[in-house]
A protein has these predicted regions:
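Short, well-ordered helical secondary-structure segments
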Residues: 2-4, 96, 118, 140
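Acidic, proline/glycine-rich low-complexity IDRs
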Residues: 4-10, 127-169
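Residue-level signal for the start and early helices of compact helical domains
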Residues: 6-8, 31, 60, 77, ...
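Low-complexity, serine/threonine/proline-enriched polar segments
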Residues: 35-135
Length: 169
């Protein structure tokens, strides 16, 4: 009966990243963010250490712009520079999406959605970023917030990864 249906499980990760070491007691965890009614996240859940390591490696090696970051330990990254190129690519992509928007297609779902995604999510992933090392922030953000964060870094800056959690949306 369900053979012809394609189910997509809508899970992704939230990464806590800071320029300061993060105490374990301040790690992002499954109870940090608002969930359920009124929140973006249906629910959040912890992941085990092996999955966490794989997710961090995936973030650095396949999601973040190539060469901009280097994994130097299980919990630390080095920012190598490259934000100017990322910003140029970002602006070019937003312009491309904006040029595709016309009076004829502006009310169609895809054209405005893709432009909005290009603006808010330059990495084009479902990963979110929690940029608070103290664990007090009540929200995580899409990749534009991470891009803004990186704009304030100097090459060679060490970044610390705290909690990494799964979320369902």
């Amino acid at each position: 009966m369900f053979d012809n249906l394609k189910f997509t499980i809508m899970h992704s990760r939230i990464f806590q990243i800071s320029t300061e070491p993060i105490d374990k007691e301040n790690y992002l965890n499954e109870n940090t963010l608002q969930q359920g009614d009124g929140g973006f996240y249906d629910y959040c859940s912890e992941i085990d250490d092996d999955v966490r390591k794989e997710d961090i490696a995936n973030l650095v090696n396949y999601v973040l712009p190539k060469g901009m970051f280097e994994l130097i330990s299980d919990d630390t990254l080095r920012y190598n520079g490259g934000i100017e190129q990322w910003k140029e690519e970002y602006v070019a992509n937003v312009k491309k999406k904006a040029e595709a928007l016309t009076v004829d297609n502006m009310l169609e779902w895809g054209s405005t959605y893709y432009l909005k995604q290009a603006v808010e999510n330059p990495l084009d992933v479902a990963y979110h970023f929690y940029l608070d090392g103290d664990g007090c922030q009540a929200f995580a953000e899409q990749s534009f917030a991470f891009m803004e964060f990186v704009c304030g870094l100097e090459p060679g800056t060490t970044l610390y990864i705290g909690g990494v959690i799964d979320y369902h949306f």
